[in-house]
């Protein structure tokens, strides 16, 4: 326990703290340098780094690194430290954050819906953990982030849906802020670019892929979680496990209360909040 505490404290000061004081470009260079120094401990080293302009969105850039034998793309330079130990390790970190092992127990889902998949690390880890899974669907509407997830998952069988999830199928206004992973239907703080994206309901996604239960859903809709759950009616009994990030992304207000209410309406039980923003639930089907 003492070693773990020392390691965590050292990690915070060496890797995480500098992000608060350095501009993005210098922080990236710093982490690339640090990864070389600690590679003998973690067996990880950022071998190459490049920064790529995004077509149609010249104000944004994509970062690309080579760690070991794998290449990873991501949209925020301040997140580079997440990938020092590889893409699967980053996915496992997210898996733990969403308490997936806790809600699954010894069960194995028939399919996984990753709603708000970002650059795909959660889906990627799921594909490793459950190699025989019938389908994993990664849903992501942000066109900048999509370039990353398409690259990161290109060697997998994971299906990528370039849409948003809402309470209706329509073309809707969407506010783009990929560098902080805050792109949303709800205007985020700071500068954001207004675009239009295709939105679909969870019902329509489940039906498109002919998913059968039991389904595991991981959801992070940047404040749009209640509307996403509204679009789940015909197929709600196919979903057995769900884990939702209900953080304060809706004008600074958490959606936890609305999320719990919707889950109860859909017949979920064992609804549990973890920390400030993770809500998990299980349904007997």
Located regions from the model:
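Glycine-rich adenosyl-binding loop in Rossmann-like folds that engage adenosine-containing cofactors
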Residues: 68-104, 163-209
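Conserved glycine-rich SAM-binding loop
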Residues: 118, 142, 166, 224
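Short, well-ordered alpha-helical microsegments
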Residues: 123, 146, 168, 225-227
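Conserved acidic-Pro-Pro-aromatic motif
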Residues: 109-110, 127, 132-137, 156-158, ...
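Short, charged, surface-exposed secondary-structure boundary motifs
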Residues: 147-148, 170-172, 250-255
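S-adenosyl-L-methionine
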Residues: 1-139, 147-148, 255-259, 266-285
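The conserved acidic donor/metal-binding loop of glycosyltransferases
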Residues: 116, 164, 220
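Short, conserved SAM-binding/catalytic segment
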Residues: 148-158
């Amino acid at each position: 326990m003492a070693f773990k505490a020392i390691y965590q404290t050292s990690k915070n000061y060496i890797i995480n703290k500098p992000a608060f004081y350095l501009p993005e470009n210098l922080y990236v260079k710093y982490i690339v340098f640090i990864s070389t120094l600690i590679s003998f401990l973690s067996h990880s080293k950022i071998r190459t780094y490049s920064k790529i302009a995004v077509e149609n969105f010249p104000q944004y850039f994509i970062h690309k690194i080579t760690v070991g034998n794998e290449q990873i793309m991501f949209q925020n330079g301040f997140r580079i430290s997440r990938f020092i130990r590889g893409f699967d390790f980053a996915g496992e970190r997210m898996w733990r954050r969403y308490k997936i092992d806790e809600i699954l127990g010894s069960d194995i889902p028939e399919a996984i819906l990753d709603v708000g998949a970002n650059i795909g690390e959660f889906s990627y880890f799921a594909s490793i953990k459950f190699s025989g899974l019938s389908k994993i669907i990664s849903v992501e509407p942000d066109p900048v982030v999509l370039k990353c997830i398409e690259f990161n998952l290109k060697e997998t069988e994971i299906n990528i849906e370039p849409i948003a999830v809402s309470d209706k199928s329509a073309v809707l206004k969407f506010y783009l802020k990929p560098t902080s992973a805050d792109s949303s239907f709800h205007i985020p703080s700071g500068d954001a670019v207004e675009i239009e994206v295709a939105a679909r309901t969870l019902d329509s996604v489940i039906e498109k892929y002919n998913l059968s239960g039991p389904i595991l859903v991981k959801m992070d809709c940047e404040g749009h979680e209640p509307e996403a759950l509204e679009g789940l009616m015909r197929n709600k009994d196919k979903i057995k496990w769900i884990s939702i990030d209900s953080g304060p992304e809706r004008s600074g207000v958490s959606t936890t209360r609305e999320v719990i209410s919707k889950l109860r309406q859909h017949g979920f039980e064992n609804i549990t909040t973890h920390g400030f923003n993770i809500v998990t639930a299980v349904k007997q089907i």
